[in-house]
Each structure stands twice: as structure tokens, then as C-alpha cells.
Amino acid sequence: MFVYGTLRRGEDNDITRLLPPPRFVGLAQILGTMYDLGAYPGVRLVGRSTVLGEVYEISPALEAVLDEIEEVYPQERDEYVKRVIPVSVQGCVLSCIVYEIGLRYVHGKAVLPDGDWTRRSPAL
């Protein structure tokens, strides 16, 4: 699982606080565009910018919990779509799940050019 926003360590939905516990694999970058949606980010898997995140090995049970948090349901096309993409971590290419934001949700939203949610400017 590649996480880039509120699921990162120290953020509101820190994946390391969820059960069953995930195993940290490493830091990674993917190609994409990160948008500031207010309380959380969204990433579109397009563009030549990089998005910074963390990779975790997760169980199917934790995947189901994460799907609930991100409101991903197989029957519906909602805010996030679950994708599987190749991610390079410490010289190994892994197939990782990532939650991609739907196009209609980023219209008019600000791009975070450095692609790092943890470095965003605090809300005023």
C-alpha cells in the first residue's frame, strides 16, 4: 500500500495506528499530481511531478478498513478509486495499492507542487 496523505505516519488517519498493524517497507515516490482538498489531499496518477509517500505491507483485513476510511466501494464510483501501480522501494519494484482521487473532485483545487502532504502550509 502506497499512502501519501492523512494515512502517513503522524497524520490524522495514521496507518500505523490501525489494526491489524501494517509493516513499514520504506519511503517512496510516484509520478502524479497532488491536490489540496482542504482536510486531506487527493492524487491523480497523471503528470510528471512526484508524490512522496510511504509503502506498507498490509493484510486483507486492513485493506478492508482502509477502503472504509477512503469510502471505496466496488459497486460505486465515488471520490477515490483503488489502483495497483508499480512502486520502487529501496531498489525493488513492488505492486502497490494507491487511492486515486476522481477527476471531478480536483476541479479548481490547488496543486501541491512538492507532492508532500506533510510539508503543506497550515490552514489560516
Predicted regions and their residues:
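Glycine-aromatic micro-motifs
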Residues: 1-124
